[in-house]
């Protein structure tokens, strides 16, 4: 299962765990993803998206219709 936000495109980032003794081991920083259903009034249906916390705030600010229109212009299938 892909760990990518469908709205913002956020992906896992890589970095280091750093111990108290400054020993470094590689790790992944995963995005804060949640599967969420949104009701789209214009299409009269539910849309299920995998979104990050920032993606949820964008949907709150812009509205689900605007976000879906932007996703469709990028060529993403919804």
Curated annotation (Swiss-Prot):
Q: Name one GO biological process term.
A: translation
Keyword entries, A-Z: Ribonucleoprotein, Ribosomal protein
Q: Name one GO molecular function term.
A: structural constituent of ribosome
Lineage, top-rank taxon, reads Bacteria
**GO cellular component annotations, sorted alphabetically?**
cytosolic large ribosomal subunit
Region (Disordered), start-end ranges? 1-24
InterPro entries assigned: Ribosomal_bL28 (IPR026569), Ribosomal_bL28/bL31-like_sf (IPR034704), Ribosomal_bL28_bact-type (IPR001383), Ribosomal_bL28_sf (IPR037147)
By sequence similarity, the record places it as follows: Belongs to the bacterial ribosomal protein bL28 family.
According to UniProt, the name of this protein is: Large ribosomal subunit protein bL28
């Amino acid at each position: 299962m892909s760990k990518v936000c469908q709205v913002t495109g956020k992906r896992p980032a890589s970095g280091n765990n750093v111990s108290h003794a400054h020993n470094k081991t590689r790790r992944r920083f995963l995005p804060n993803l949640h599967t969420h259903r949104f009701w789209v009034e214009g299409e009269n249906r539910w849309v299920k998206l995998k979104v990050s916390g920032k993606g949820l705030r964008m949907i709150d600010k812009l509205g689900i219709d605007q976000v879906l229109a932007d996703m469709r212009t990028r060529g993403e299938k919804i």
